[in-house]
Amino acid sequence: MAVKMKKPDYWPTLEEGERLAGIQRERDAKRRSIINKEDCIRIRGANEHNLKNLTLEIPRNELVVLTGLSGSGKSSLAFDTIYAEGQRRYMESLSSYARQFLGQMEKPDVEKIEGLSPAISIDQKSTNRNPRSTVGTVTEIYDYFRLLYARIGIPHCPNCGREIARQTVDQMVDRIMELPERTRIQILAPVVRGRKGEHQKVIDRARKAGYVRLRIDGNLYDVSEDIKLEKNIKHNIEVIVDRLVVKEGIERRLTDSVENALQLADGLLQVDVVDGELMQFSQSFACPDCGISVPEIEPRSFSFNNPFGACPVCAGLGYRMEFAPELIVPDETRSINEGAIAVLGWQSCMNKGSFANAILQALTEKFGFSMDTPYKDLKPEVKKMLMYGTDQSVDVYYEGQRGKGVYPVTFDGLIRNTEQRYRETASDTMKAEYESFMRITPCGTCGGKRLRKESLAVTVGGIDIYDLTCMSIRTLQDFLDNLELTTTQQKIGHQVLKEIKARVGFLIDVGLDYLTLARATATLSGGEAQRIRLATQIGSGLVGVCYILDEPSIGLHQRDNDKLLRTLKNLRDLWNTVIVVEHDEDTMLAADYIVDIGPGAGSHGGQVVAQGTAEEIMAVPESITGQYLSGKKAIPVPEDRREPTGWIKVRGARVNNLKNIDVEIPLGIMTVVTGVSGSGKSSLVNEILYKHLAKTLNRARTIAGEHDGIDGLENLDKVIAIDQSPIGRTPRSNPATYTGVFDMIRALFAGTPDAKAKGYSKGRFSFNVKGGRCEACGGDGILKIEMHFLPDVYVPCEVCHGKRYNRETLEVRYKGKNIYDVLDMTVEEAVTFFENVPSIRRKIQTLYDVGLGYVKLGQPSTELSGGEAQRIKLATELSRKSTGKTIYILDEPTTGLHFEDVAKLNVILHQLVEGGNTVVVIEHNLDVIKTADYIIDMGPEGGDGGGTVVAAGTPEEVAKVHSSYTGYYVNKMLERDKARGDR
């Protein structure tokens, strides 16, 4: 089934790659020879989290990798010790006035750190979820484009598309005189437009010039008044220059007034037509055919975050949230009486005696349909009436507690009624529930382009600014390189274009050439967001800084890893110290220095197992990392690949960059979907496959991406997506509550003789409800103290001393431990503690099996990484009884995992398959890819160059497809493993 394509011309040969690597090694050796060997960061007595009085030296101005098992203490050393101390020292050098705006970091638990530079952290947790944030805005490239379009853009008429030029005073007067005779008008000079401040000088200037009236924010003021404006609010101020009635003979006076207004407002003029629309004129631009004037072009005219540039309907978002008929009635095979209507407020319509049922009964009599008819069989006009209402009044017979009667009702429709309920509710929970019945649709006015039509009518090189931001970064670079400008435009835009090209180049260098500037940052993966910030830092050109990165290779295909490594080395070559928390083998081999933290996780970690170059790490037998790097340990390739038990077929997939493709996915085995970043993996698996299956099998309220359908679902009964989203949003959520084992533990405590004697139920042992919890802190265990210009301080509750429960509850013990002691246990400790309680031990054992032995049962969800959250979800699924017809979907589950952890994860994934289930994984990790039963490789490139299936088959089959980047690296991996004798 492998699909062969032409091999790309630019694909480097193995010999060429070795030659380039040799050149780089020579450069690195030369650079290291001039570095002062004594120049290092000296850390003494680090005890943050699980670090055990750790002492080590890290060379400065080098690329240093911190590695080790998950939970071994890498992040505690890198972020909670080195970064925290570097940031704290820098902030302490500032004044107390400045610190009140910046906050102050707590001193880490470390005895001493020497040789530390100001530190910059580039992690994955600070992705901006604001819908107004895009790749263009966070990289500031869009700001430069706004400036470019404002300075050299060519305006066109938004109505007819004709290129427009500046207006003269005579043209403005002629246009005003075309108004009907006797029309009353005001000549206004817009001196302030949407700017904050008190604007006292502007008001005084108008007063001194002899003008009598001002219009401020739509209200009229006499200049003799004492006008005070709020300085933190944006204001609009217009000077009323003249009031006129259109008639013959006013041309001279009108001309004088227009000239005065233009002089006051720097070439701008507004004519307020009484009982008509406001007319705007500019000495800058106007269409000679349509008579339409375009406001002065400024950088803010192209900002969708500014009212002067944003579409007035969607306020610059580019979309609207609206209730979707297909979510309000998710299953059209049901009748109304069978619960077809799922939206809140109408779920009771099947219950006789409810007012909703009475309304629908009246509608059935009026429009002649039955509530027992499947919704799909209702007439189109009936469906339309149910959704959007009717102007015809219906008589509703209703018998309630206060009596019975007939009430005339005009039915607004399910959608309008639900919209009203959504607007009126003050509950965030209810709003979130209503929003689950909504879908995102492009704004009907701007078509999703976010800007005013006047702004979209300005072009550079024949392209408007929105279409420019929709180009992939690679296409954008080609456009800029071939952009033809006039001599004047070139002179004006030269410096701006230089800055844009540099930033675009940095994005390409970190492997993000498939992204567009219009891409919302909320849709980026953690790795993509981190690499964007990395590109921004390179552009800053800082020297002598300590950069700390958290797995920048996440989500990056092996093909693009070399680009990332070159970027990290460029950052280092600027004489910066680059510390990377990483598990990627290529990054470790390319590093100047490696620190292996371990030997285990949690309480078994926190020590330096080995440090030095990659070769020196490999020589340390105690280093698990070294054993994997040297090949002494490896994840074995299966002897045999499983055969599919069936197939499902996705037809006509065309969401995002997918090219209307058909894709067959095998059942009963483990399938890995691969491809370079942006090739269409997530579009296929998350947007189409998961959402379609969730709606069809799980009856979820989801709308799948564009496709024709999916065949073969009769072999499945449910779909489960195991992603890296948090298991909870508050500290009250923890692994014990998420897996459900805490209910069992509370029941166990309630069954102890002491609890029975006191009449305690299992609710007594919950920290979420009154009774057993400490009421002084509400069961939180901590209290927040506001410190004004210092950051808020969290201190243990003085009553319960951080134990969350009251004294009486803590007196109840099981095997000598109270409920707090159990929550404070690590998973590893709890497995032994509950060994004689099979139901509890089984659930905790699955947490241990997925490599979470170091995590505490009561560890707040807010302290868990995305990878840890995903493994907790995996463990929860493993602890449930399998139906054998489940399809599990995972998106890069190896994020944050060491070689040893990946080996454990592989065992878990194959256990799910052994239970008769199907596992579909989006993954770049070659150790997972090589052990899969089947590979679907997307590509060949990212963005517009992707969206097709390049290869499909077993790893051995895909390895033979020369056009597959994944196949190239899988082949190298299989050949290497074969040479090492792993098979």
Residue ranges: model-predicted function:
Residues 1-983:
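Conserved phosphate-binding elements of NTP-dependent enzyme cores
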